Regions:
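Non-catalytic accessory segments flanking P-loop/AAA+ NTPase cores
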Residues: 1-443
Length: 443
């Protein structure tokens, strides 16, 4: 169920394991992602005519907007990038221009393809690494030795490789040659400046220069993996595949789009990160060509999902042209006390399970009574009502507060079973939640 051809029903069933409620949002997104698969099954001429139906998600923070898109992109192995609209400025002003989100998507896509190729060659890479380390640990075979000696050496090399693979020699130190670390390049600068940076690096920094390092066998394995991967992988085909995948099935999630909406009260004020950014977004969303360090990419088949709380502005405050580029609108529901409880008990990797796993490392077995979980949900919901509504994120803060002392003194509880009761939850949280002046301290 981890392939691109998941049906909408399968996508929603998968999302239900991690996100409670929001049926309409899940349904709309599932259809949008399935349509990408359907489009790829058509003949080329028709593929070009079908563009994705971009989605605008409306809902307060912490209700699952980002998580829905991120989870689908992950299970379907699609290039995905999440950006915040408020971080961009209009072209001509100091700051990031909107085209950099497309370059970020291409970078993620190339990395995704590279990791897939590495996974396919995993065994081959490990064999090459182990063989190289084994030859370093064994003294070299002199020239002109007999066939018998050669066979003995081959047997010794094989035994050495087996010991290295099993981790028996991980602590032994060896001297190996590794490539110098390459200089990091800022990919968010325009392509022209990027090319200048790359040329300067070629002049002042030879990537093939190697340095000798003394490392443990365990460290040497990791150091050599990256080097041997580069020699076995076809870099050019990976770049081309990454570029193509970003172009045909990439997803850009634009969060906080409401922050660049200009309400009627603000109209007339100069703000380079608002209406100007919307106008810069237009050509990218409707389809244009963006230059990246891997080549040019057309954006017309990239799926754009915009999201915002729209507390201070309305979707209609976005410029009409941009509104038209997001034809599908989904409103996400605020979280109720019941949904808060279900998030804690029914999700596959619930916060409770996460904390239980973390404390189990210290030998502490944590159990939550059902009444305690209900109280956590109730107090978290009340805190959201009295202060800023931050949705499910409130649960992280309240559980952290309840388990704070146990986490701090974990070694004292090692080997014990600790039960979290309703009374414990109340003693840790109720005095804070009850006081509206103090509730702001529960972030």
């Amino acid at each position: 169920m981890s392939e691109l051809n998941m049906t909408p029903r399968e996508i929603v069933a998968y999302l239900d394991e991690y996100i409670i409620g929001q049926k309409e949002a899940k349904k709309s997104i599932a259809i949008a992602f399935r349509n990408r698969y359907r489009r790829l099954q058509l003949e080329k001429s028709l593929q070009e005519e079908i563009t994705p139906k971009n989605i605008l998600m409306i809902g307060s923070t912490g209700v699952g907007k980002t998580e829905i898109a991120r989870r689908i992109a992950k299970i379907m192995k699609l290039p995905f990038v999440k950006v915040e609209a408020s971080k961009y400025t209009e072209v001509g002003f100091v700051g990031r221009d909107v085209e950099s989100m497309v370059r970020d998507l291409v970078n993620n896509s190339v990395l995704l393809v590279e990791n897939e190729h590495k996974e396919k060659l995993k065994d081959k890479i490990e064999e090459a690494v182990i063989e190289k380390i084994a030859k370093k640990l064994l003294p070299p075979l002199p020239n002109g030795v007999s066939e018998e000696k050669k066979q003995e050496y081959a047997n010794s090399l094989l035994k050495m490789q087996q010991r290295i693979a099993q981790g028996e020699l991980d602590s032994r130190e060896i001297e190996i040659e590794v490539r110098k670390k390459s200089i990091e390049i800022d990919s968010n600068v325009p392509p022209e400046i990027l090319r200048v940076q790359e040329n300067l690096i070629k002049v002042f920094h030879k990537e093939q220069d190697k340095v000798k390092k003394t490392l443990s066998v365990k460290e040497a394995k990791e150091a050599l993996k990256a080097e041997i991967s580069d020699t076995l992988l076809d870099g050019e085909s990976i770049k081309m595949e990454g570029l193509k995948r970003a172009e045909s099935s990439g997803v850009i999630f634009i969060d906080e789009i409401d922050k660049i909406a200009v309400s009627s009260k603000e109209r007339g004020r100069q703000d380079p990160s608002k209406e100007g950014v919307q106008r810069d977004l237009l050509p990218i969303v409707e389809g244009s060509v963006v230059n990246t360090k891997y080549g040019s990419i057309k954006t017309e088949h990239i799926l754009f999902i915009a999201a915002g709380a729209f507390h201070l502005a309305k979707p209609s405050d976005l410029i009409p042209e941009l509104q038209g580029r997001f034809p599908l609108r989904v409103e996400l529901e605020s979280l109720t006390e019941e949904i808060m409880y279900m998030i804690l008990t029914q999700t596959k990797t619930s916060i409770i399970k996460q904390y239980q796993a973390l404390l189990k490392v210290e030998g502490v077995e944590i159990a939550f009574e059902d009444d305690a979980i209900k109280e956590l949900a109730k107090l978290s919901y009340n805190a959201n009502q009295k202060s800023e509504d931050i949705g499910a994120r409130r649960l992280h803060t309240t559980i952290e507060k309840v388990l704070e002392d146990i986490s701090f003194e974990a070694e004292d509880y090692s080997g014990q079973n600790v039960t979290i009761t309703k009374e414990l939850v109340q003693s840790k949280l109720e005095d804070l939640v009850a006081d509206e002046n103090l509730v702001k301290y529960i972030l």
